[in-house]
From Swiss-Prot:
The keyword Signal does not apply. Its EC number is 6.1.1.4. This is Leucine--tRNA ligase. A motif ('KMSKS' region) lies at residues 722-726. ATP binds at residue 725. GO terms for molecular function: aminoacyl-tRNA deacylase activity; ATP binding; leucine-tRNA ligase activity. A motif ('HIGH' region) lies at residues 66-77. It catalyses: tRNA(Leu) + L-leucine + ATP = L-leucyl-tRNA(Leu) + AMP + diphosphate. It comes from Corynebacterium glutamicum (strain R).
Length: 952
């Protein structure tokens, strides 16, 4: 990369990269030494020492915090960080108390894998990575309150992660009140009989162990022997979101198998309705709201009970009106009744060969089929183009018509949605139609309007062939009426019930790793789980010699998890007094998933050094509490602006909302939601290059010749991609800062385009941002002598128009995060001043400019502010205001068309009448040349736009 000043003799006081680096270092030190960006709290150790009241007007702006990777930052990472810094700086100038800081989401698999490879403790690697990232971010001049920075790996942070886990563990969800309540309030309800145990047993007749189990069944955190994604190659289970569409681990690309294991789960499904309904309260993009709605997947319909060999198989359907068209049933291969029904299954004698998958018996067919789908992800199973399944050897009774319908298992039905069983209506469902066609099953029309000989008819229509002799006749009814009448009949006959189902599953909350938050849970000799008291927090990670979970052959689906913490026997086996004397206990050897710390970190930013509470509610109320007078009567509260990538829409953001709602229910926070406003920034893209094998090669080493691209002499293919390590096209911000200056990088990234769109990086274009800053510098500083070039002089009317229009536009753009157009307006104003004042310049024209520039280019603004005689930082200088009178023109210029072609331009008073405009147009010399000797047929004035003359 070449220095733009290279090859010339720089003037002594020119704004060069060297001078920029010097200025930037000095001002960054000044900000640090003076705590320039420190935001005071109402109470606690961050409250004003003099007891001074805080401004009512505040702003809490937050970035999705980074994972401290060993590779450090590339220029794509700071895009959102710079934008939030610009927004925060602007709002400080509006007089707001602004909280803006940045922490580190530092637990996770990369540091652990590096530790496994090198023997280096993950904490050592993580802290080194954090220090490197701090250095890189510090060089950008970000105005963070460094006192509030946190790292999820700090025991003083994860102490409170564990504490929040225990709040959730020690709570239950009251479905009637639709909120979490302490477990202590559950037990009296069970004792009085007001609430039943989950299995219907008499609570008071139970023994101590059974009573504890009855209570545990209600907890928001529970252990479940459920189907999980087991990855032998990583030695851990994965959440659905960590498995790719082709059934492999997102990290490492290992096969993932479905396996039944006992795991910690969080009952996020209890909050499904609130998670959907409260989206309406949030200032989020419709795209993200839609993603969350779809992920939660609320469906209204009915549960219908089918009888099969003495067992009741319950299915969920959104179309109970199509029950008469159900010609077979399908269970998920993992459904709990599959093995029960197999014991009652008949033989395959006389069964259609297409139903048996080439096996001799139902038991053999099921075993073979389960093995064949073990490595498929849920997504892959649902999207599988080829429909497969096997007959269970039993039949179920259709409750509306008594038909005996065959029962199958098939991979397109999942245990994770509905009941794990479906009634198949092939005439009106595409997947059922494909399955029925492949296996030769009957297809019965029950909704009029299509041609089921050709395809399933999935639109609405009148019900047909839908009546029985037992009081149900929906023939001729439209969908909604038919659905309602069918549900009414099912409930009357006790064969079903109207209900709501969700796609959302409970949150798998355990990982078989080392580098994560330990669980504050121990087990007694009977295997009963006990929550540790607050006084025993944090439960710190022990030192271990081997960080590796017991990983297995990636293809070994039968392997069992063995976490690395299980090897630390002195830590695992403990003697504790939990209130009933010292006893022996065993610690839980799993760790929390990487989402735990990020599910609440915004609250620790509010009160980062509080030893007594995770967050004092008075501080929380000030920074994130509802403000109906500002945001409307339904304001849920939360962080004022949260900026990050849309890829976190259904993971981090959903989990954070869940945790926050529990904390709200328990009275620990005043805000209903963690993030009032969400803004998704785009990505910085860059050219990437692949060789003939499709392998990415280092972009820095690619050469261009005659429009083609070569790497080590071999021609390579050029493509655009998201900048990053995997595409080998990363550009380090360190290089740009060193060669151009941090302010230049900031201006360039902000000017590249709208913040919410992706944009291409081009290092060769960075010099344009530097030239703008050099022109700004030259307005104030003589490049030869270093003298200040301002003078006291009244601004002209043109100056005032340019200045006030710039102020008005820039204020609006800063407010709405349109920083690219802020830069455009500032460039336009600098160009005007450069042209108008080639020597010295009125101070009144340039002082407001420096203030307007400072949010986006703070270092040069501070330096110029100082040169113009100010002792204090520009950070808290009031942002310029504008006068309306300068925003309107006294005169306007109008094009004059003759027979539709522009032939001249006239200048008239802004309030000129149509007659005056026509008079001026006819008097214009160029127009007269076009109309001379011709008849004027028509004259049209479009106010403020144009004049059109028609001649013949």
């Amino acid at each position: 990369m070449t220095n733009p000043s290279e090859g010339t003799t720089p003037l002594a006081f020119r704004y060069t990269p060297e001078l920029a680096n010097k200025i930037e270092g000095e001002w960054q030190n000044y900000w640090t030494d003076n705590g320039t960006f420190n935001a005071p709290n109402p109470v606690g150790d961050l409250a004003p020492a003099d007891g001074k009241a805080l401004p009512e007007d505040k702003l809490f702006v937050q970035d999705m915090f980074p994972y401290p990777s060993g590779a450090g930052l590339h220029v794509g990472h700071p895009l959102g960080y710079i934008a939030t810094d610009v927004f925060a700086r602007y709002n400080r100038m509006l007089g707001k108390n602004v909280l803006h800081t940045l922490g580190y989401d530092a637990f996770g698999l990369p540091a652990e894998q590096y530790a496994i490879q090198t023997g280096t403790h993950p904490r050592t690697t993580t802290m080194a990575n954090i220090e490197n990232m701090k250095r890189q971010l510090g060089a950008l001049g970000l105005g963070h309150d460094s006192r509030r920075a946190v790292a999820t790996t700090d025991p003083e942070f994860y102490k409170w992660t564990q504490w929040i886990f225990l709040q959730i563990f020690n709570s239950w969800f009251d479905a009637e009140q639709q909120k979490a309540r302490p477990i202590s309030e559950l037990i009296p309800l069970l004792e009085s009989g007001e609430l039943k145990t989950k299995d219907g047993a008499d609570y008071n007749a139970l023994g101590d162990v059974e009573k504890q189990k009855a209570v545990d069944d209600y907890r928001l955190v529970y252990r479940s022997n459920s189907t999980v994604n087991w990855c032998p190659g990583l030695g851990t289970v994965l959440a659905n979101e960590e498995v790719t569409a082709d059934g492999r681990s997102e990290r490492g690309n290992f096969p993932v198998f479905r396996k039944n294991l006992s795991q910690w789960m969080m009952r996020i499904t209890a909050y499904s309705d609130r998670l959907i309904d409260d989206l309406e309260l949030l200032d989020w993009t419709e795209k993200v709201k839609s993603m969350q709605r779809n992920w939660i997947g609320r469906s209204r319909g009915a549960e219908v009970d089918f009888s099969a060999e003495g067992e009741t198989v319950t299915v969920f359907t959104t179309r109970p009106d199509t029950l008469f068209g159900a010609t077979y049933m399908v269970l998920a291969p993992e459904h709990e009744l599959v093995d029960v029904l197999l014991e009652k299954a008949g033989s395959y004698e006389g069964v259609d060969a297409r139903w048996t998958n080439g096996q001799a018996s139902p038991a053999e067919a099921v075993a073979a089929y389960r093995a064949s789908i073990a490595a498929k992800s849920d997504l892959e199973r649902q999207e599988n183009k080829e429909k497969t399944g096997v007959f269970l050897g039993v039949y179920a009774t259709n409750p509306v018509n008594g038909d005996q319908i065959p029962v199958f298992i098939a991979d397109y039905v999942l245990t994770g949605y509905g009941t794990g069983a479906i009634m198949a209506v092939p005439a009106h469902d595409e997947r059922d139609y494909e399955f029925a066609t492949v296996l030769g099953l009957p297809i019965k029309e029950v909704v009029a309007g299509g041609n089921i000989e050709e395809a399933a008819f999935t639109e609405s229509g009148e019900a047909v062939n839908s009546a029985n002799d037992n009081g149900l006749d929906i023939n001729g009814l439209a969908k909604d009426e038919a659905v309602a009448k069918t549900i009414e009949w099912l409930e009357e006959k006790e064969l079903g019930r109207g209900t709501i189902q969700y796609k959302l599953r409970d949150w798998l909350f355990a990982r078989q790793r080392y580098w994560g938050e330990p669980f504050p849970i121990v087990y007694d000799e009977n295997g009963q789980a006990h929550a540790l008291p607050d006084s025993m927090l944090p439960v710190e990670l022990p030192e271990v010699e081997d960080y590796k979970p017991v990983s297995f052959d990636p293809e070994d689906a039968d392997s069992e998890p063995s976490p690395p913490l299980a090897k630390a026997r002195e830590w695992v086996e403990v003697e504790l007094d939990l209130g009933d004397g010292k006893k022996k206990y065993t610690r839980d050897t799993n760790v929390m998933p990487q989402w735990a710390g990020s599910s609440w970190y915004q609250l620790r930013y509010v009160d980062p050094s509080n030893d007594e509470q995770f967050c004092n509610i008075e501080n929380e109320r000030y920074w994130t509490g509802p403000r109906p007078e500002t945001h409307g009567p339904n304001d849920p509260g939360g962080v004022d602006l949260y900026v990050g990538g849309v890829e976190h829409a259904v993971l981090h953001l959903l989990y954070a909302r869940f945790w926050h709602k529990v904390l709200f229910d328990l009275g620990h926070v005043s805000s209903k939601e963690p993030y009032r406003r969400l803004y998704n920034q785009g990505y910085i893209q860059a050219f990437a290059y692949t060789d003939s094998r499709g392998v990415y090669v280092p972009a820095d080493d690619v050469e261009e010749k005659d429009g083609k691209f070569f790497y080590q002499g071999e021609e390579v293919n050029q493509e655009y991609g998201k900048m990053g390590k995997s595409l080998k096209n990363a550009v380090a911000p360190d290089d740009i800062c060193n060669n151009f200056g941090a302010d230049t990088l900031r201006v360039y990234e902000m000017a590249m385009g709208p913040l919410d769109t992706s944009r291409p990086w081009a290092t060769k274009d960075v010099v344009g941002a530097q030239r703008f800053l050099q022109r700004l510098w030259r307005l104030v500083v003589d490049e030869n002598t270093g003298e200040v070039l301002t003078r006291d002089e009244v601004l002209t009317d043109d100056d005032n128009k340019q200045l006030h229009r710039t102020i008005a536009g820039v204020r609006d753009d800063y407010t709405n995060l349109r920083v690219n157009t802020v830069v455009a307006k500032l460039i336009e104003y600098v160009n005007y001043l450069t042209k108008t004042y080639p020597d010295t310049i009125p101070a009144g024209a340039v002082l407001p400019l420096i203030v307007m520039v400072s949010p986006v280019a703070p270092h040069i603004a501070e330096e110029l502010w100082k040169k113009l005689g100010h002792d204090d930082t520009v950070t808290y200088e009031p942002f310029p205001t504008f006068e309306e009178k300068w925003l309107t023109d006294d005169e306007i210029e109008l094009p004059v068309q003759v027979n539709g072609k522009v032939r001249g331009r006239i200048t008239v008073a802004a309030d000129a009448s149509q007659e005056q405009v026509i008079e001026a147009a006819l008097a214009d010399e160029k127009v007269q040349e076009q109309i001379s000797g011709k008849n004027l047929i028509k004259q049209i004035v479009v106010p403020g736009r144009m004049v059109n003359l028609v001649v013949k």
